[in-house]
């Protein structure tokens, strides 16, 4: 009977019930959903489809024929252990009651009791209310028909009313004839253990969000075996399509199958004892939709094995070899790359780097019953009163862990239990003279304490915090002090160590890990590859926010030194362990860092006090959750004592805990922990102490500094001082490495000028800027060089060496090259290569014109390009740096538009151009903001520009010559400028190419004018300073003081160089000579041996902003008003900048590049390390000087693949994308 024929009435239990249920399902709060179902038991919610169906809220025990054992089996066998399923209710169909469940991922599922299969219904409860049960054959396969009056929206009715109106039957009469088809259930149970192991084995692969991520993971782990605990095949050896032997014909067959099925990525080949040759082994592939395919070289057919990786791991090869009833297992995981196989966290495809979001406990969605107080030592002291017993019981406080837990203070007898505190004094965790005092019960905030279930917290007379497991009566140390317990709560209480949190709570507590497929994460289960990665990236740091202000630094065994003697670490590596880094709080001294070790099982261990302790199951978990398994589990550690290896349990935790939390005493002897190698530390390890006066204690600056540098209270301080803040001299000296004096060898500058010079130079060293409009121009540099401030004790006559060093380094960086930096010369070369390619394509477009278009041109296209010009372009001469060539192709542009378009605008332009010739003005000029020295520039003649170029082209050119637009369009493999014109496609293509050629060549010529203008500025400065240097050196040689410069090798090359620089026509070579001037100048003893002690002291005073002078009786204390932490930049590189520069500079060879004649010989600096072209996703090729423009054309898709012509392109090895082959560049 239809609902519309019945008048069903009933009192809705709560008008906001549906909104409440939607909110609970959206937050996936399964415990609250169970409470909701219990409150609204036997109330029914109408659903839109199937018709006349109602969702009856009921617990599992009230579903007829649905036993607790059935639910546990389903939960266990069908990925429910990942979802943590919760029963919402049931839907009645004829003679059956079908359970509807919700998972921890908010998805809705349907459990078919007849086939014992879990079906995916929709993504969330809101979709379930809007659309009902669609897409499953369990209830109906018909499409819904919505008619007016049939469904009036979701509403509640009681089961009793619906039964009285014959809408629903009694639930106890249903499911009587259901017979479970448990085909193969015993086999499934036997495979479950292997299945869970394979989930962890394939976890990294399952987290991939796209085929590109899968391909990158496989390429990084080629040759790695993934275990398959299933029949037929025993392992999967990862390999790319190139590394898996295929053969030409078989590869073609695979491509044909891709065209028929979908695009796939090869995962590797399957191993079995019967396959001896790799060429006969079948391969496993994954498709764009996430499906897993089997490809055999005999049948040459892609056979689907599963809808997703999770299904394949559960089903195995059952579909291929036999039918054991597995084909419906794993249907719930239908989406590719969205959830990991462990179901813990989503994978975000848009993220490009690993980011740890700091933990913020204030973000919890607290209910109204949450206590307003946080547990604190002062709160506990107030509860004790005058004695050692709690005199004010019942006070409830929040604790840090687990989330939504509180601590109710009180003695045992306050909670009506027969336990006593003194009963636990016998514990072996306490010393003979130690005793315990009560604190209270820890329990969930929504209920009162359960004395026989909840843990009870106590603290000892020595400060340790103890927790009693009231279920097992075991005692555990959970913190070294009450302050630590305030910070970490019950983190180290074993029953709570594996506390299951819903995704939102876990994200709030541990923070959210967004992984963009970082290489070290992809290699976390590949120990040999991880060793290579650590060796290449030694010194790289990662933040670990499971603890406050904590970091992990990659380093290998050769990068650290153990203070207790040699041989200890080597024993670890002999036992299949590898050192991958160190960790500590960021402000800890280098010798307080603990080594992190990876085992053969890829678990993470910490090495402290001659033993290793397991802290995490994987590197990702370590970054996300810190020391997840440390101290609170009954694990075993390996301990090395001399030459004897034995096992001990994790009981000695005091030193380790203090080290990790920065609680080591101030006056401590040197700890026996990891430290940096001796050759990387300063030998003098004395302290510089900054005294803080009483009136400065509440200063915001002082409070800020003491967050980073721990204050020390010293009794011998004067009465006016409160405490001192120590900073090691090694830390300050390492900070000095971030100056121009130490990094670039530039000496004598005052700290203010030194900092300015360092900032300007280091921006180019680290490629901070991208376009010429973003960095300082030559005229500003000239003013800076003239205004540099020098130290008072620095001889004025050697200031020219400092200025030459700054001038040479900056001029070379901005105009030409430090390997692959984006300089002016870079853009000239980049765009001239592109223009050359466009000209060749323009010539090919001319040949493709129709007969009518060719006739319309009247032979103009054939006679215009002479053979001389073609030869010039073929040889890549200096044609793109000539203004006459630009005017020539501009006139060609106007004539082509007049002949092929013929509109009024084109004819008018052609007539005016013929009348006025080169004096013709297109209409306006533009003043380029980033190059003011060249004044206004006349824009080329552009006709029929498309949006947005007709409006914004002038502003783009004024800003950065449109370089950002040009590079962006080239990266997208299309022309920078498009046209809007009503002509045939072949004419439009021809005119578009010609317009872009004019635009590109205009930019090239403008940049070339800027290069010459800036060369003039730098050249004038250079000749002036070189003249001063020659005079100073000649004077030193004549005086002969201290025997310095007595050898003519210093002066003669400088004199020759001065004469060469002044020769006509050699101005373009002066930067090459500037390097010689630097080498000679840096060898001058007065400059080389300059005492930097005054500079160092002034550097500290300058950066610390020290204003007050210290008294005579406090010579070791420097008083200051303003302390600023974090200003030191540590130079971790082994060599300075000048040493690396000397390795980069190559000699200029006449035929190295033919078109360097008209620019400068120094363009070869740039050409020696031309930027690799593109984003790396186009077959990985790169451009080098000897490459032809065909390489660019190939990248843009205008040419076919160049197979054997190694002269024009080359492939970059997979492990070093984007590197420059054959040249030693910047690291």
From Swiss-Prot:
Pfam families: Herpes_U5, US22. Disulfide bonds: none annotated. InterPro entries: UL27-like_protein_herpesevirus (IPR010302), US22-like (IPR003360). Belongs to the herpesviridae US22 family. This is Protein U7. It comes from Human herpesvirus 6A (strain Uganda-1102) (HHV-6 variant A).
């Amino acid at each position: 009977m239809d609902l519309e024929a019945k008048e069903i009435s009933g009192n809705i239990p709560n008008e906001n019930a549906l909104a409440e249920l939607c909110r609970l399902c959206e937050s996936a709060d399964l415990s609250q959903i169970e409470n909701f179902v219990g409150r609204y038991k036997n109330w029914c919610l109408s659903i839109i489809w199937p018709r006349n169906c109602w969702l009856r809220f009921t617990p599992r025990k009230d579903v007829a024929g649905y036993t607790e054992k059935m639910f546990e089996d389903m939960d266990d066998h069908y990925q429910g252990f990942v979802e943590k399923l919760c029963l919402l209710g049931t839907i009645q169909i004829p003679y059956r009651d079908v359970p509807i469940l919700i998972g921890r991922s908010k998805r809705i599922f349907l459990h078919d009791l007849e086939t014992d299969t879990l079906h995916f219904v929709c993504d969330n409860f809101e979709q379930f209310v809007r659309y009902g049960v669609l897409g499953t054959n369990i209830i109906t396969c018909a499409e819904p028909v919505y008619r007016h009056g049939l469904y009036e929206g979701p509403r509640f009715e009681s089961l009793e009313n619906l039964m009285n109106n014959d809408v629903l039957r009694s639930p106890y009469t249903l499911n009587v004839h259901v017979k479970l088809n448990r085909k193969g259930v015993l086999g499934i149970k036997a495979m479950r253990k292997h299945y869970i192991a394979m989930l962890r084995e394939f976890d990294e692969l399952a987290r991939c969000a796209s085929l590109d991520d899968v391909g990158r993971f496989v390429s990084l782990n080629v040759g790695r075996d993934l275990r398959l605990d299933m029949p037929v095949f025993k392992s999967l050896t990862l390999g790319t399509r190139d590394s898996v032997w295929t053969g030409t014909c078989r590869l073609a067959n695979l491509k044909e199958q891709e065209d028929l099925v979908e695009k796939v990525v090869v995962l590797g080949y399957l191993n079995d004892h019967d396959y001896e040759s790799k060429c006969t082994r079948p391969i496993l592939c994954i498709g764009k939709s996430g499906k897993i395919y089997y490809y055999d070289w005999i049948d040459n057919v892609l056979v689907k094995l599963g809808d997703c990786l999770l299904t394949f791991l559960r089903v195995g090869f059952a579909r291929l070899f036999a039918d054991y009833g597995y084909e419906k297992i794993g249907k719930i995981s239908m989406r590719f790359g969205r959830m990991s196989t462990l179901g813990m966290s989503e994978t975000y495809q848009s993220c490009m780097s690993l980011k740890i979001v700091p933990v913020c406990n204030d973000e919890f969605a607290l209910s109204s019953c949450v206590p307003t107080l946080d547990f604190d030592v002062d709160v506990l002291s107030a509860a004790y009163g005058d004695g050692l017993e709690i005199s004010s019981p019942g006070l409830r406080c929040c604790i840090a862990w687990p989330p939504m837990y509180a601590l109710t203070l009180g003695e045992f007898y306050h909670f009506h239990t027969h336990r006593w505190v003194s009963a636990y004094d016998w514990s072996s965790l306490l010393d003979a003279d130690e005793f315990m005092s009560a604190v209270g019960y820890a329990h969930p905030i929504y209920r009162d304490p359960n004395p026989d279930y909840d843990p009870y917290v106590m603290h000892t007379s020595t400060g340790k915090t103890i927790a009693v497991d009231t279920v097992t009566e075991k005692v555990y140390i959970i913190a070294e002090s009450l302050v630590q317990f305030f910070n970490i709560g019950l983190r180290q209480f074993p029953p709570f160590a594996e506390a299951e949190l819903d995704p939102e709570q876990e994200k709030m507590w541990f923070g959210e890990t967004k992984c963009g497929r970082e290489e070290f994460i992809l290699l976390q289960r590949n120990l040999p590859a991880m060793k290579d990665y650590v060796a290449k990236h030694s010194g790289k740091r990662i933040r670990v926010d499971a603890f406050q202000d904590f970091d992990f630094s990659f380093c290998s065994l050769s990068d650290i030194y153990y203070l207790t003697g040699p041989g200890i670490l080597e024993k670890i590596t002999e036992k299949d362990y590898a050192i991958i880094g160190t960790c500590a709080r960021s402000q800890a001294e280098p010798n307080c860092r603990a080594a992190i070790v990876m085992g053969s099982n890829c678990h993470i261990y910490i090495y402290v006090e001659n033993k290793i302790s397991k802290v995490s199951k994987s590197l990702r978990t370590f970054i996300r959750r810190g020391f997840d398994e440390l101290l609170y589990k009954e694990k075993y550690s390996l301990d090395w004592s001399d030459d004897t290896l034995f096992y001990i349990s994790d009981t000695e935790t005091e030193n380790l805990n203090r080290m990790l939390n920065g609680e080591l005493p101030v006056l401590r002897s040197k700890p026996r922990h990891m430290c940096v190698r001796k050759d990387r530390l300063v030998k003098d390890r004395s302290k510089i102490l900054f005294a803080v006066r009483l009136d400065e204690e509440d200063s915001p600056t002082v409070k800020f500094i003491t967050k980073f540098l721990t204050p020390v209270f010293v009794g011998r301080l004067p009465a006016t001082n409160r405490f001192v803040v120590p900073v090691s001299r090694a830390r300050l000296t390492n900070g000095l490495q971030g100056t121009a004096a130490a990094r670039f060898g530039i000496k004598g500058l005052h700290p203010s000028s030194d900092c300015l010079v360092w900032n300007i130079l280091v921006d180019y060293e680290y490629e901070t800027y991208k376009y010429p409009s973003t960095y300082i121009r030559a005229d500003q540099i000239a003013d800076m060089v003239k205004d540099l401030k020098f130290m008072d004790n620095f001889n004025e006559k050697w200031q020219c060496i400092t200025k030459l060093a700054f001038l040479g380094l900056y001029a070379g960086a901005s105009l030409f090259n430090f390997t692959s930096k984006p300089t002016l010369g870079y853009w000239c070369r980049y765009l001239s290569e592109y223009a050359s390619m466009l000209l060749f394509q323009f010539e090919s477009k001319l040949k493709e014109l129709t007969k009518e278009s060719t006739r319309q041109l009247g032979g103009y296209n054939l006679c215009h390009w002479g053979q001389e010009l073609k030869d010039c372009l073929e040889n890549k001469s200096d044609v793109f740096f000539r203004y006459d060539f630009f005017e020539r192709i501009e006139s060609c542009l106007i004539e082509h538009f007049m002949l092929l378009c013929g509109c009024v605008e084109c004819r008018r332009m052609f007539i005016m151009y013929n009348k006025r010739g080169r004096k013709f003005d297109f209409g306006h000029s533009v003043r380029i903001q980033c190059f003011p020295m060249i004044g206004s520039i006349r824009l080329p003649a552009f006709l029929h520009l498309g949006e947005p170029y007709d409006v914004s082209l002038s502003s783009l050119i004024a800003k950065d010559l449109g370089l950002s637009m040009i590079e962006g369009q080239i990266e997208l493999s299309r022309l920078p400028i498009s046209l809007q014109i009503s002509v045939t496609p072949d004419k439009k293509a021809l005119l578009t190419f010609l317009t872009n050629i004019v635009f590109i060549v205009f930019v090239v010529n403008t940049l070339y004018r800027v290069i010459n203008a800036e060369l003039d500025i730098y050249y004038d400065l250079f000749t002036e300073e070189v003249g001063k240097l020659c005079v100073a050196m000649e004077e030193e040689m004549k005086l002969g003081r201290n025997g310095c410069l007595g050898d003519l090798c210093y002066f003669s090359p400088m004199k020759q160089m001065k004469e060469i620089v002044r020769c006509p026509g050699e101005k373009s070579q002066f930067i090459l000579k500037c390097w010689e001037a630097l080498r000679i100048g840096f060898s001058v003893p007065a400059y080389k041996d300059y005492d930097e002690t005054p500079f160092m002291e002034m550097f500290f005073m300058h950066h610390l902003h020290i204003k007050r002078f210290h008294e005579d009786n406090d010579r070791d204390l420097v008083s200051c008003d303003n302390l600023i932490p974090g200003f030191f930049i540590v130079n971790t590189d082994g060599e300075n900048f000048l040493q690396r520069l000397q390795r980069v500079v190559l000699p200029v060879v006449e035929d190295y590049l033919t078109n360097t004649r008209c620019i400068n010989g120094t363009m070869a600096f740039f050409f020696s390390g031309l930027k690799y072209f593109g984003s790396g996703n186009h077959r990985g090729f790169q451009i080098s000087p000897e490459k032809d423009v065909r390489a660019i054309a190939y990248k843009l898709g205008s040419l076919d693949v160049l197979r054997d012509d190694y002269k024009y392109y080359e492939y970059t090895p997979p492990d070093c994308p984007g590197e420059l082959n054959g040249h030693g560049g910047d690291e």
